[in-house]
From Swiss-Prot:
Family: Belongs to the glutaredoxin family.
Lineage of the organism: Viruses, Varidnaviria, Bamfordvirae, Nucleocytoviricota, Pokkesviricetes
Keywords assigned by UniProt, alphabetized: Disulfide bond, Electron transport, Host cytoplasm, Redox-active center, Transport
Disulphide bonds in the chain: 13-16
InterPro entries according to UniProt: Glutaredoxin-like, Thioredoxin-like_sf
Protein name from the UniProt record: Glutaredoxin-2
Pfam family, one: Glrx-like
Inducers of expression: Expressed in the intermediate phase of the viral replicative cycle.
Biological role: Glutaredoxin necessary for virion morphogenesis and virus replication. Functions as a thiol-disulfide transfer protein between membrane-associated OPG128/A2.5 and substrates OPG095/L1 or OPG053/F9. The complete pathway for formation of disulfide bonds in intracellular virion membrane proteins sequentially involves oxidation of OPG072/E10, OPG128/A2.5 and OPG088/G4. Exhibit thioltransferase and dehydroascorbate reductase activities in vitro.
TM region positions: none
Complexes and interactors: Homodimer.
Record localization: Host cytoplasm
GO cellular component: host cell cytoplasm
């Protein structure tokens, strides 16, 4: 069973789309799940299944710790049911306007370094 990369992006965001396209190149190593963050957090979105308290905590954590990320990536281990935050910003080159904005070698390194169960995320 492969680990899963969960990509939280915004609709109509060209950077999010380019990151998603680039990450697809890792699909032989990971299952990839794309999540529209706005739809996810809507009142009737998928996050509503968590209940009001957990949902509110999740929204608060996103706002507090991930608001400076255009797109967020987590890796998930389905066997242990643990998640790890992947610091994608280290792999992005914002001077590029296509999927080459993601340096896949750096991203792979960040995915491997991401530690399960650490929250809030440790960023440099």
């Amino acid at each position: 069973m492969k680990n899963v990369l969960i990509i939280f992006g915004k609709p109509y965001c060209s950077i999010c789309e380019n990151v998603s396209d680039a990450v697809e190149e890792l699909k032989s190593e990971y299952d990839i799940l794309h999540v529209d963050i706005l739809s996810f957090f809507l009142k009737d979105g998928d996050s509503s299944m968590l209940g009001d308290v957990k949902r509110g905590t999740l929204i608060g954590n996103f706002a507090a710790h991930l608001s400076n990320y255009i797109v967020s990536i987590f890796k998930y281990n389905p066997q242990t049911k643990q998640m790890a935050f992947v610091d994608i910003n280290k792999s992005l080159d914002f001077t590029k306007t296509d999927k080459s904005l993601v340096n896949l070698e750096i991203l792979k390194s960040e995915i491997e370094k991401a530690t399960y169960g650490v929250w809030p995320p440790v960023t440099e």
